[in-house]
Amino acid sequence: MASRNLNAGLLAIAGPLAAAAWPADARADQPPPVIAPFSAHYSADWKSISVGTSDLDLKQNAADGTYEYTWRITARGVFRIVYSDDVIQKSWFSVNGDHVRPEKYRAEQGGSTVSIDFDWSGGRASGESEKKPVDLKLTDGLQDVMSIQIEVMLDLKNGNLPRAFKIVDKDEIKDFLYTLEGPARLRTPLGELDTVVVASQRAGNNRVLRMWFAPSLGYIPVQAERSRDGKLEFAMRIKTLKR
């Protein structure tokens, strides 16, 4: 039961997302992308116990401007016995104006997989989740569990929070409310950072996810915590950032 709860918690905090500054060696006549590529490394703790690491990698396709975002969790120590395979999630998406549109989502953990394609012209999200068929109606603003992090970052930048979102989670569409909880200053390996705290929660659910976004880093989340009934369960904290 503990290992199942650990896995659910790590997936629930679903990868804080960074949007780093445009690289210094970029062409002067080339406009910066809405979201610049980055690689970030985080610690992962379960009830104050170190269970492994989390790596986030955002790439942009130079040909069409679309993005590929990968989140990988690697267990360490005794937890590696339970989770011998890395947990991997990927989202491919485009950015239209200041909004994210997911195109496909993939996840794998050992023999368990999720594969969802977003057909916006046909108005359906279809695929398979843990061997169950997925067929959901698309609506404007619908996100997957990875692309939502980028959408929230862009909304912070543009002052569009608080806001409700619909998110495809496996074979369901779930409703979440993202709210602002105010400023906070954090000490991190990147230095002391002023952050904005954002909380997300489903109606009637006792679990709350909080993320600390740093405006000076392009609203990169430098910390994420999930709590239940006010008690901390899981946490991710940034260690390094490359861009």
List the model feature ranges, each with a label.
Residues A19-A28:
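Boundary at the C-terminal end of the N-terminal hydrophobic targeting segment
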Residues S3-R4, P37, D144, I148, ...:
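Hydrophobic alpha-helical segments and their boundary regions
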Residues R27-P32, D144, I150-L156:
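N-terminal trafficking/processing presequences and adjacent post-cleavage segments
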Residues M1-I13:
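Bacterial N-terminal signal peptides that target proteins for export
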